[in-house]
Structures are given as structure tokens and as C-alpha cells.
């Protein structure tokens, strides 16, 4: 049976794991790393890079390098968070045809789901390379506080990448699975997950294979990227004070600042001070300018203190919803790279009144949990029951624009709730129902999920028709809706007009685009491999020609040199078949050279044998050493 992989699709880094016997194993990528940067780059030559190769060239290609796209997924273009992001990233964020936030590269628009699919494809290839077989099914993680649109967009990304997404699982829940799989005694734990772009806090009761989420809360626009941008702003402001030049208008300089900020942030987790040194950051009429400054841990902590404090309110809300006090939490599990920051650990310790648990790898534990869930769904992992919750309330807009909740937040999923609606006017044959998700009291302050047009209602006085609408949240946290006319018993077909997202046709086109790109990538890889083989063949043939060229005729030598020249001439092209044909030709004409090499080698071996034979005829004489010292 083909394996189900677990993927942590992160804002900054992604990770893939698979069940290996009874344990989850993180798979190393082609660069030998256990995590892969969630970065996609589009070069001027039309090449597409994913992961570490994309991140490496970001400084020289800032506008063509897309990072932290998870913060855009499932969001509208006019979302205030998107507006904020537009001012911070060097790549272009544009309005998609459906009104969502998309990115534009080389005059082509890409949805965040497409960019995410490119990262997922990389993770899929990593797993396939390790397993030696095709991978078609996956469990993908999302922040617990993701809404329906963001979850659906993540599922779409999996489909575009050629994966059947068996389950969308919350990141803190996945971490709890990996942490508590071998724990038999009952415990109440809190998972504090501060990653590259999002923050989640979940409270769970675990024990004897049952993982029950009691509550969850969070902030989908708070993470390591925000800490980096705080430092970028600080560096740019200090440089402006010193040199009078604003680096915020220079995309190349901003990318260098971001790289330096990330490095400084990491270094300050283990040292009290670091030095930022960026030579030739910019130039003016007086010449090149260099940025050099020292940064202490204390200064960094003061710059990001408001970000750290923003994690406390969701923690309070999660505890309140779970009906618990901080002292009733048995263990606090830290997840996400940002939890390595000493200040974060200190704040968590102060809030919960206990040292946080550091026994799990914060970068890998989520992917491992996803792999375990994959094992559960496949039947390989027995006696594990996962009870998750919906993070946000689900409801409809009622008279006066009020948000009327049908399913409260932190309701265990899957769940179903029905509500009966009627008409507002006589002989009304259609009703429009607007479905929202969120916690605000007015509907328009929440996230519009979809608009339902119930058509074909029989003519009747207002308030008479009884239309039962059922809201259903599945195990992925994704909302489904059905409707029935109770008067006639007839099921009504609901035409869902999502407020954004991708249509089936969009996804189909993107799948085809991904497949064609996969074919292009395969062709490009074949070209590179063929060129590498050709260059190795040219090198070895030229070396042999230098050493043994005098052992073949001038005519043979001329043919070999001509074949080498022909092969070199096609190396600059993109036709691997032509390169292979020229390699074959060179191999054929070089046969006489190889023959000469073997003959020379055999002659040398025979000469050595004769010499050894001659040495065998020599008789060893006995001798006695006389120590004759003259006095």
C-alpha cells in the first residue's frame, strides 16, 4: 500500500514526514536539509526555483522571489492584512480575477494556492525520492485559527500539486499527536505554536490514545516574519539617521536587510550581542555606503515586545473557553522556530507558571504529527482518536446586519446544525442567505464565506415557506451546506457563490499548468544531467588524448578531436537528445583510444611481470653484522 505523507506547509519553512514502522520519520530534501524554505523564485530566463535554491538568489532577484505566501492564502485583496503585507514585500501583490490577493511574476498572475502547490510538489518529490515510489495522498497542516477560505485554499493547493488531501489538520493538534502518542497517563496540555507567520494556542486533554481539543485561539498574522520586519525597520531607520538615505525604497537593499535581520534574530537566541555588517548596501554621489551596527539581545527584545505580548491575549481566551486556569495545565509544549527565542520562553513560563517542555523539535514536530494522522487514516496506527474543534463561530446575517451564530467556536468537529428560514415578502420565490465566520457581533465585520441563493420557492404569503438549511463542518474544518423545503419535502439545489477562492475550472487549469511545469522541470533536469555527463566525458577523453594520443593514428586522433568539438558546440543548447547523440558519437570514435590505453596498460603489466621474474632468480645471502669499533 502506498504511503500517506504528512506535510507541514509553513510560512517560512516546510517539512515532510512519513511513518516508518511505529515512528514518524522526517525526510531530508535533495540538499540534505530536514526543512525546506517556503520560497519560490521566477528567474529572467523563465526558470522556476523552489526551496533553498530560490532563497539563495533572493538578494539578487528580490522582485522575482515569493516568500511567506501562506499569509495571503484565502485572503481578499482588500483585506487590511494584505494591505500591510504589500508595503513590506518586494514582490508584486495584485487583485485576482476572483477578488482574492494573488501575486504577479513575469506578467503572469499566480494564486497563493498555486505558489503553495509548487512548495508541496517539492515536498512530494522529496518523499518520493526517499520512498522510491509514487506518493499520491497526504495530510497537510494549517494554523488552528485558519478560517474556511484559508483551509479550502490549502486543500486546493494540494490538489494542484497532484495530491489527494486526506485530511487538513491543525498544527497544534498535529504537534500534540507527535508529543503524546506514547503517553498513557491523562494530561492537560497547552500547545504554544509561534511559527514564521502565524500564532496558535490550543488546549488539549490527552491520554490513552485520545486527543481531545478543548479550545483553540490565535492570530493568523503574527509570526517570525513580523519579528524580522521589526528589525528591518530598525536597521533602515538607524541608517537613515546616520547617512540620510532611506533604504525602504530600495528593494535590493531591503532584501539584504531582511536576510541580515533573520540571521541576527537567530544568533541572538544563543548570544547576548551580534554585529550586522552589510558592505555596499547603497551609494550616493560621495560614493558607496556600508551598514555596520551592533545589536544586543536586550535591544531586540524591546523592539519586538509588543509582538511577544500579542500572544498573551489568545492564551487567556483559550484557557477561558476551556474552563481552565493556567495552573491547571500540566505541560506547555513549544512549537515553531520562534519559540527558541529566550524572551518567548520567559513569557510562556511567567504566564503558565511552569517551565515549557522542550523535548520536541519545534521545526519538525508538526510534520511528524501529520504523518501520524496519515498512519491513523491508513490504519497503520491503531487506537488513536483525535477530536478537534472549529476555531471560529459559524452563522448567518439576520435583520439589521446582526451576526447570528449557528455553530459556536470550539465545537468538536465534525458537527452539523440545522436552522429553518422563511421569506420576508409575499410570493417571494428566492431567498439570499449570507454565511459568515468569525467572532464579531455585526456580520460585515466577520469573514463572508459564501452567499446562498435558494431559488424555486412556491408562491406563498411571507413567513409561510419553511426552508431548512443545514450547516455541516467536516473533519477538515471545511463548511458544507445543504437545503430542503420542509413543506414539499423537496431538496433544493443551492448555488454556492463563494466570496473568493478558486472554482473547479480554475483548479483544473492550475493542475494542468503544474503538470506542464513538472514536464518542463523534468526536461530541464534531463538537460542538466546530460550536460554534466557530456562535460565529464569531454574531460576524461581530453585527458586520455593527452596521455595516449601518440598511440593512435593521426586520422583517429583527428576524428576524436572533431567529435569533442561537435559535443562542445551543442552544450549551450537545450536539447538533451542532441547532446546524447554527440556523446554516443564521441564514445564510438574514442574506442581506438581506449584500445590503445589497454594495450599500453597490458604492456606495462608484462614488463613488471618480467622484472619480478628476474628478481625471483636472485639468491639472498646470509650475512653477519660485525661491530668493529676502533679504539
From Swiss-Prot:
The modification Phosphothreonine is found at residue 198. The keyword Iron-sulfur does not apply. CDD domains: ASKHA_NBD_HSP70_HSPA9 (cd11733). Induction: By stress conditions e.g. heat shock. InterPro entries: ATPase_NBD, Chaperone_DnaK, Heat_shock_70_CS, HSP70_C_sf, HSP70_peptide-bd_sf, Hsp_70_fam. The keyword Aminoacyl-tRNA synthetase does not apply. One of its GO terms (molecular function) is unfolded protein binding. Transmembrane segments: none annotated. Keywords: ATP-binding, Chaperone, Nucleotide-binding, Phosphoprotein, Stress response. Acts as a chaperone. PANTHER family: HEAT SHOCK PROTEIN 70KDA. Belongs to the heat shock protein 70 family. NCBIfam families: PRK00290.1, PRK05183.1, prok_dnaK. This is Chaperone protein DnaK.
